[in-house]
């Protein structure tokens, strides 16, 4: 079953309205837009989805809406991670109920948990997911949890774990993980090194910028399948030009602004305390949206 999880998975954004409430209609349009651009699946409720500034009820509502739009059409992975094991279990149960294909969880953070506590946290979530495969989410830059290679090797061999989302620039470690676990589904997490991650052994990727240019990442996959490394590098360079701009604007708010100009997202706002895009970047983001729409067409 784990091999069905391979591919290009957009880390789904969560649209909000001017009152900072969930914009369900924009969310539905965004799901349909992603399906239309040919991505293999959605990773719902993660960092890109601003999960950690949402209530548990809101996170469940997002899962429900996404399932209504996409279940059976593409692979659906629910990120259910929180600092609380009980809350993560509740979200895992919801993911199972709504028909998701897998669950994922970031390592619990903020408190200095022992490694055995991390393992127990994952075991509990896996139990509540009732048969859904687990995607361990390693993102040390945001979680503050610096797992060693030995600890990663232990986590990915827990019963019920089928995949790892490796959001790290350490490509040597990516290759070490692949060598140690040839059957593990391994996702590259940093969009700017997607092609390099595939060459280091990743099966696919989970990324935020796939929301606006998923076809480019699919093109990188296809180029490498055909042995055309030069084409993969060219496509990665084009992606990275976009990422350069988004880093300046703030990635999530920049993506929402581009999608607003594409008529996908009604309001290009993140949830506070994240601020709106600086107006000086709006012309560049509008031009990017136009460029991508023409390219997609």
Curated annotation (Swiss-Prot):
InterPro entries cross-referenced by the UniProt entry: Aldolase_TIM, DapA-like, NanA, Schiff_base-form_aldolases_AS, Schiff_base-form_aldolases_CS
Pathway this chain belongs to: Amino-sugar metabolism; N-acetylneuraminate degradation; D-fructose 6-phosphate from N-acetylneuraminate: step 1/5
EC number(s) on file: 4.1.3.3
Reactions accelerated catalytically: aceneuramate = aldehydo-N-acetyl-D-mannosamine + pyruvate
Keywords per UniProt: Carbohydrate metabolism, Cytoplasm, Lyase, Schiff base
GO annotation (BP), single: N-acetylneuraminate catabolic process
Coiled-coil ranges per UniProt: none
GO molecular function: N-acetylneuraminate lyase activity
Residues engaged in binding aceneuramate: 47-48, 167, 189, 191-192, 208
Source domain of life: Bacteria
Intracellular or extracellular location(s): Cytoplasm
Positions of the catalytic residues: 137 (proton donor), 165 (schiff-base intermediate with substrate)
Gene3D superfamilies named among the record's database cross-references: Aldolase class I
A GO CC annotation given for this chain: cytosol
Family statement: Belongs to the DapA family. NanA subfamily.
Oligomeric and partner information: Homotetramer.
Function, as annotated: Catalyzes the reversible aldol cleavage of N-acetylneuraminic acid (sialic acid; Neu5Ac) to form pyruvate and N-acetylmannosamine (ManNAc) via a Schiff base intermediate.
Protein name, per record: N-acetylneuraminate lyase
């Amino acid at each position: 079953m784990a091999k069905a999880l391979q591919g290009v998975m957009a880390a789904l954004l969560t649209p909000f309205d001017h009152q900072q409430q969930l914009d369900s209609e924009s969310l539905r349009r965004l799901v349909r837009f992603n399906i239309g651009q040919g991505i293999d699946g959605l990773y719902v409720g993660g960092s890109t989805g601003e999960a950690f500034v949402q209530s548990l009820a809101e996170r469940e509502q997002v899962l429900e809406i996404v399932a209504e739009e996409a279940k059976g059409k593409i692979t659906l992975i629910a990120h259910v991670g929180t600092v609380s094991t009980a809350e993560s279990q509740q979200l895992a149960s919801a993911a199972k109920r709504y028909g998701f294909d897998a669950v994922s969880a970031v390592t619990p953070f903020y408190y200095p948990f022992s490694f055995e506590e991390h393992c127990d946290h994952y075991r509990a979530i896996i139990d509540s997911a009732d048969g859904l495969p687990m995607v361990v989410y390693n993102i040390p830059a945001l979680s503050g949890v610096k797992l060693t290679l030995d600890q990663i090797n232990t986590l990915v061999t827990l019963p019920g774990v089928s995949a790892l989302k490796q959001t790290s620039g350490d490509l040597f470690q990516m290759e070490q993980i692949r060598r140690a676990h040839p059957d593990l589904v391994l996702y590259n997490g940093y969009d700017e090194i997607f092609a390099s991650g595939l060459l280091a052994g990743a099966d696919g990727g989970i990324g935020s910028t796939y929301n606006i240019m998923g076809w480019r990442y699919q093109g990188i996959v296809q180029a490498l399948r055909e042995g055309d490394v030069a084409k993969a590098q060219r496509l990665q360079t084009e992606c990275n030009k976009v990422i350069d701009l988004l880093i300046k604007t703030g990635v999530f708010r920049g993506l929402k602004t581009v999608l607003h100009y594409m008529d996908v997202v009604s309001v290009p706002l993140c949830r506070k305390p994240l601020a709106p895009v600086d107006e000086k970047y709006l012309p560049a983001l509008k031009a990017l949206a136009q460029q991508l729409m023409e390219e997609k067409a």
